[in-house]
Amino acid sequence: MIIVISPAKSQNFEPIKTDYQFTQPIFKQQIIKLINTLKHYEVEEIEKLMKISPKLAEEVFAKHNSFNPNKYDNSNAKAAIFTFSGDVYKGLEADTLDNKTIEYAQNHLLMLSGLYGLVRPLDLIQAYRLEMGTNIKIDGKILHKYWQDKITTQLNEYFSQQQNKILINLASNEYSQAIDKKSLAAKWLDIDFKENKAGAYKTIGIHAKKARGLMTRYILENRIENVSDIKKFNVAGYQFNPDFSDENLLCFTR
């Protein structure tokens, strides 16, 4: 069983004290091609491309131009699971997971990324900003199409080493479309979270994002390897709701 989640635009590069064996990014050649493409963009072009403020565009420009795709170590990079710090990662709280759970996560959790493609928890990453939905073409393909074959092939290699071939999709649509479902050698299982608002159940972005992190943590801490145990998730008031679920979707409501 493998979980996939989205990355986060917010990243924390404060150093941490750990004794983990960090790993290198999977798709180094592709990263070089992408970062070299991004380095050709001036501040004003980044502002338009990413639809961000001039100040933020300057920060992104600086990040990409200081990016060294041939060097990943503690001087310029940090393990991905401790770096991303958006809503999903607030739910995950990776810095409070014990060493054995982080080591388990290394083989069961992957983060999708516009720049890195697939990221394992202990892969070292440098500061960047490139959302999967960014309107940029690489080799004549939009970003998620550029990554699709590469990511899916790598996932299939990982699933060949997994006993239970199930992909738990806790990523957003923007990122999960970078996986080719038809070519995936595993069952695809979506998970959704809904809130009861005035008698109607709705998916509310900020709550759903944090819940994805909570679910990721639950699966990792409990070493869950089957769907029936996922249904037992009962955290932050969420419970499995069969009325909104089917064989390809588990929905949790509160």
Curated annotation (Swiss-Prot):
Family the entry assigns: Belongs to the UPF0246 family.
- Protein's name according to its UniProt entry: UPF0246 protein FTN_1542
* PANTHER family named among the record's database cross-references: PEROXIDE STRESS RESISTANCE PROTEIN YAAA, PEROXIDE STRESS RESPONSE PROTEIN YAAA
Any Gene Ontology biological process: response to hydroperoxide
The cellular component terms of Gene Ontology attached to this UniProt record, alphabetical and capped at eight, are: cytosol
